[in-house]
Amino acid sequence: DYGIKKNILRYFSDFKCKVTVVSCRTSVDKILSLKPNGVFLSNGPGDPAATGKYAIQIIQNLIKKKIPLFGICLGHQILALALGGKTKKMKLGHRGANHPVKNLISENVEITSQNHGFEVVRENLPKNIQITHKSLFDNSIEGIRLKNNPVFSVQYHPESNPGPQDSVYFCLLYTSPSPRD
């Protein structure tokens, strides 16, 4: 938990998920003792590099254990850091609803809700990371996935309600019996 909103917990419960919230400093052993089907990397405030100081190693170890991971907002940025990427402060952050994002896999445009001032840097992104979504405002990275692993994230709030519902499929993807496809 990097600062999860109550609406996100409701979002997962709508999909019949059993959710256990743990501190962002919880050890990998403790997380694994809960026998999770997946780990959600939540949103939260601040600079991802500051939070990443203690979260990156935990995320890297979960990836090694092949635990499915799904991150949003700050969780997206910290996941990128854990995978060897970089983040930077944006000149102008993305705030509010109605941000068009292109899904580079389906070619669909999704209208999203966003609230962030940092972004994942495109240059020198490791080759094992696939960019899955981009902003149609400024071409910034809005989604990534780790190739050949059930690990993915988006920069925006797919659960935003009231608000755009174009990205609600992420919970279905994450909670499906085979999130590796």
Q: Where does each model-flagged region fall?
A:
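Active-site-proximal beta-strand elements of phosphoester/diester hydrolases
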Residues: 1, 112, 152-156
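Phosphate-binding active sites in nucleotide-utilizing proteins
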Residues: 2-57, 61-62
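A glycine-centered loop/beta-turn motif at secondary-structure junctions
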Residues: 143-173
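Conserved small/polar residues in nucleotide/adenosyl-binding loops
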Residues: 174-181
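Cysteine-nucleophile active-site neighborhood
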Residues: 38, 43-111, 117-119, 163-173
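Hydrophobic anchor at the start of a short beta-strand
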Residues: 19, 69, 151
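Catalytic beta-strand/loop cores that center a nucleophilic Ser/Cys/Thr
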Residues: 108-149
